From Swiss-Prot:
Organism, scientific name: Clostridioides difficile (strain 630)
Pathway membership: Metabolic intermediate biosynthesis; chorismate biosynthesis; chorismate from D-erythrose 4-phosphate and phosphoenolpyruvate: step 6/7
PROSITE patterns named among the record's database cross-references: EPSP_SYNTHASE_2 (PS00885)
Protein family membership: Belongs to the EPSP synthase family.
Compartment list: Cytoplasm
Binding site for 3-phosphoshikimate: K21, S22, R26, S172, S173, Q174, S200, D314, K341
Catalytic activity line of the entry: 3-phosphoshikimate + phosphoenolpyruvate = 5-O-(1-carboxyvinyl)-3-phosphoshikimate + phosphate
Keyword Transferase: yes
Gene Ontology terms, MF aspect: 3-phosphoshikimate 1-carboxyvinyltransferase activity
Primary localisation category: cytoplasm
Name of the protein described by the UniProt record: 3-phosphoshikimate 1-carboxyvinyltransferase
């Protein structure tokens, strides 16, 4: 894997943010479960989205790519039914999730709506991410399964039946989303009961909104239980994916530490959970300027605060950079789930930002960060092969006093393939010979 030499830089200008990965996953799945042909626009073909496209194709959806547009004939359309019969006629259908936790956790229950044996494979840390919620359902419904420890090689056979599903809300909302996608298509009614406090509520809001946009109704009883009528049909439609707040957070955080970037295509009333970055940075003292879907931040210094990571775990790495350069103490709580992402993000944040002179104390499910006046450079840092850690360190380099060497930068392709192109466009200085050019 390659390395980049990134120099301290002043970033300025306008940047169009990539489309929301969370919304794109959901739109591809809902349109693939439909009874007709949908058109999904403003798609960014990151590794994770490609994994979901290929997974839905393997189940019978017919998906054609035209620039940033997907035309999708759903599994329950006339064309899709014929294609599905051919696909599922294989002795064992393999679904490659690459490194996408969303693809894996969304597709497992969806695949069980259809006959046949399915094998889920993947790479990286995906095999270490827990699936116990589904294993409990498999045991209760006599669905056969086998798996290997610490790698993704899951084989399942059987069909998911309508039921009352009791699911913990503090593990990952992806399990709930996976069930919400497929239960409306089963032959009778189901119920999901949430047995603990719910984390990542914003992601469920996105799921419920997208499902409704495609013509399926689910009753939400205050996030305590979800009532799902069976025999519903997803309706094909045209759908545009909005800009991604989890990626916009990198540039808003750059503004917070003194850069001058205007971010385009971030909807003000978005349901995305990571839009909480605006409220957090405002609370720390940043002034937010909006003009339609254009946003930028202005600051003359920020103060530490308390950040609850339970509803917005993906933006914690870059907010840790802001906290490191703020006045006073920032405490990040309820962050234990960051340990089971593409890497142990809590540990990676601590190790890599500490190399740059940040003052961080790592606890089991929290970080305590005392602000410093500047960051040091002149060291080698590692992405831990995690896209969000790589982009976080690139933003941190702007406030370093010397260049940094970033190892394994290519992992940004997982969510934001052209991140370093945009970074350079805004004025970031990078030694390009390490980029293979």
């Amino acid at each position: 894997m390659g390395s980049l030499k990134i120099y301290p830089s002043k970033l300025s200008g306008d940047v169009k943010i990539p489309p929301s990965k969370s919304m794109a996953h959901r739109a591809v799945i809902c349109s693939s479960l439909s009874n007709g042909k949908s058109r999904i626009s403003n798609i960014d073909f990151s590794d994770d989205i490609i994994a979901t496209i290929r997974a839905m194709t393997s189940l019978g959806a017919i998906i054609e790519k035209k620039e940033d547009i997907l035309e999708i004939s759903g599994i329950f359309s006339k064309e899709g039914i014929l294609n599905r019969e051919n696909q599922l006629n294989q002795p064992k259908l393999t679904i490659d999730c690459n490194e996408s936790g969303s693809t894996l956790r969304f597709l497992v229950p969806i695949s069980l709506a259809f006959d046949g044996v399915k094998r889920f494979i993947g790479r990286g840390n995906l095999g270490k991410r827990p699936l116990d919620t589904y294993y409990e359902i498999f045991d209760r419904q006599n669905i056969k399964y086998s798996y290997k420890e610490n790698q993704l090689d899951l084989i399942i056979s059987g069909k998911l039946k309508p039921d009352e599903f009791r699911v913990k809300g503090n593990i990952s909302s992806q399990f709930i989303t996976g069930l919400l996608f497929i239960l409306p298509t089963l032959e009778s009614d189901s119920k999901i009961i949430i047995t603990t406090e719910l984390e990542s509520k914003g992601y469920l809001d996105l799921t419920l909104s997208t499902i409704k946009d495609f013509g399926v109704e689910i009753i939400n009883n205050n996030y305590k239980e979800f009532i799902i009528k069976g025999n519903q049909t997803y309706k094909a439609r045209d759908y545009k994916v909005e800009g991604d707040y989890s990626q916009g957070a990198f540039y808003l955080s750059a503004d917070a530490i003194g850069e001058d970037i205007s971010i385009l295509d971030l909807k003000e009333d978005s349901l995305q959970g990571d839009s909480e970055v605006v409220e957090i940075l405002s609370r720390m003292g940043m002034e937010i300027l909006r003009e339609g879907n254009k946003i930028k931040g202005i600051t003359n210094g920020l103060n530490g605060t308390l950040i609850d990571a339970s509803q917005c775990p993906d933006i914690i790495p870059v907010l840790s950079v802001v906290a490191s350069l703020s006045i006073g103490k920032t405490t990040i709580i309820n962050a234990g789930r960051l340990r089971i992402k593409e890497c142990d993000r809590l540990h990676a944040i601590n190790v890599e930002l500490s190399k740059l002179g940040a003052n961080i104390e790592e606890k089991e499910d929290s970080l305590i960060i005392e602000g410093v006046s500047k960051l040091n450079g002149g060291v080698e840092v590692w992405s831990h092969k995690d896209h969000r850690i790589a982009m976080t360190l690139a933003i941190a380099s702007c406030r370093c006093d010397k260049p940094i060497i970033l190892k394994d930068f290519e992992c940004v392709s997982k969510s934001y393939p052209h991140f370093f192109k945009d970074f350079k466009m805004l004025g970031g200085r990078i030694d390009e010979w390490n980029m293979g050019k």
